[in-house]
């Protein structure tokens, strides 16, 4: 009986509009050298007309086309995002309607840059239950609508995009281990999208920023210490082939590699082309690695997927492909 789960297909979709560091230097007090030397980012994709659901719809459509699955075969759709089109309906429900997956239930997961890892973990448990065979897990963001485009400390970091996987029942284990974590006591280190209560009865605080606010140093230190410990709880240099970390900053990845004593060559990166796409960053990286042959589905390569971000949330999955 097929009671395990595996990733059987990957796909990504990013907006056509490419914004370079040089373009940003014309909008704010920054430069290509300043941005690239501190982050590893050279350019990012920014939407001009699309919203998060549009990006995720394209990913879902591509996953069906590439896998040969019919929409009616999809049992569930999970979308990881903190930049939905609306508070309701969920992006996942919009995607379900757009592709005609009438048999699927659908909901969003809000775990910031850890969202895809959280969602993929939940999807595996759904398949393990034996009740569901096939699902779509997508990470999608349009962070450009949450940024203060005059603040060089945050505006230069983020990009828009979406990517995801088809997860199916399997006869052998592919999800080998995991560790998901959170620390709500540090919630204020990274916030965005504060919703102001406009009720005439509400007497509480109404002055807060809707744009992204980040305690950069705190987040950097959190990633180096806590995320490194999380990874080491699952693997060592000898027991992993590749690591796909959330693409926040190349300096973070460099330091995590040193902290964990895992070969830097095993850490895949692509933030130079996309910037920080939050919940989309890991599946975008995964799909690119499959496309260029670095990762091969069905190869039994041992891979770690690690997310970390607002909440604070962080977590890793150890998989065989």
Curated annotation (Swiss-Prot):
Please give one Pfam family short name.
ACP_syn_III_C
Compartment(s) where it occurs, according to its Swiss-Prot or TrEMBL record: Cytoplasm
Which residues does the entry assign to the active site, renumbered to this chain? Answer: 113, 246, 276
* Organism domain of life: Bacteria
Q: What is its EC number?
A: 2.3.1.180
| GO molecular-function terms, A-Z | 3-oxoacyl-[acyl-carrier-protein] synthase activity; beta-ketoacyl-acyl-carrier-protein synthase III activity
Listed GO biological process terms = fatty acid biosynthetic process
Q: Which InterPro entries is this protein grouped with?
A: ACP_syn_III_C, ACP_syn_III_N, FabH, Thiolase-like
Give the record's GO CC terms: cytoplasm
Q: Which reaction does it catalyse?
A: malonyl-[ACP] + acetyl-CoA + H(+) = 3-oxobutanoyl-[ACP] + CO2 + CoA
HAMAP family noted in UniProt: FabH
The family this protein is said to belong to: Belongs to the thiolase-like superfamily. FabH family.
Outline the subunit composition. Answer: Homodimer.
How is this protein named in the record?
A: Beta-ketoacyl-[acyl-carrier-protein] synthase III
Q: Which organism is it from?
A: Enterococcus faecalis (strain ATCC 700802 / V583)
Gene giving rise to this polypeptide: fabH
